Amino acid sequence: MKKIATATIATAGIATFAFAHHDAQAAEQNNDGYNPNDPYSYSYTYTIDAEGNYHYTWKGNWSPDRVNTSYNYNNYNNYNYYGYNNYSNYNNYSNYNNYNNYQSNNTQSQRTTQPTGGLGASYSTSSSNVHVTTTSAPSSNGVSLSNARSASGNLYTSGQCTYYVFDRVGGKIGSTWGNANNWANAAARSGYTVNNSPAKGAILQTSQGAYGHVAYVEGVNSNGSIRVSEMNYGHGAGVVTSRTISASQAASYNYIH
């Protein structure tokens, strides 16, 4: 395709002549200007006025309308490029959101599967101890685990800490005290002694977590630390484990006697 144009550029009273063409190869092969037998051949002249405006005079089989077509074609390309970028950005945004959702879901999943003590007690990966804020335990006298009569049956959810402790004390507590976080108050209302002093055979109770946790005190060591056995603490429902709790931490729990 040969497209050669002669341009007259008038600026500040100076006129120059130049060949305007679409590719160097065509310019080298054709220096004859407009060829009426070539449907793609054309020539034009233009001047630039004092304000920098272009004024064209066209000759040949090509018209300025093709400039608009080319412009629209470029716009179409730009639109496609913009659309592609937007699509890429959208993908990036979607991927970012998916990644965030994945992180969020992953975090929630980890929280769901994180070891818990009974029905929702707090679990510490550093010491495997329940950590609670020290609170004054409600207290009441009149009934104790040693002289209480056994309840008719274990009504707590099988596999949970409450179920295990009920059986561990021989059923000598209420069978309708609810979740572990309610046991201290329920025990006090029922006449049991509740305080912050651990003792062998007592029930350790904490309200930490969504449902709290209870454990059975197997013994108190000479240094004040305590040994407890419990169910569903860090190893899933129905699993009984034991651990030692330091004296400082042991003093922060409630104990039902």
Curated annotation (Swiss-Prot):
GO-annotated cellular components: extracellular region
Domain of life: Bacteria
Biased composition (Polar residues): 107-116
Region feature Disordered, mapped onto this chain: 101-144
Regions that span the bilayer: none
Signal peptide residues on this chain, from the entry's feature table: 1-26
Cell compartment(s), UniProt: Secreted
This protein's UniProt keywords: Repeat, Secreted, Signal, Virulence
Sequence repeat boundaries on the chain: 73-75, 76-78, 84-86, 87-89, 90-92, 93-95, 96-98, 99-101
Annotated stretches, region: 8 X 3 AA tandem repeats of Y-[NS]-N: 73-101
Protein name: Staphylococcal secretory antigen SsaA
Species annotation: Staphylococcus epidermidis (strain ATCC 35984 / DSM 28319 / BCRC 17069 / CCUG 31568 / BM 3577 / RP62A)
Taxonomy of the source species: Bacteria, Bacillati, Bacillota, Bacilli, Bacillales
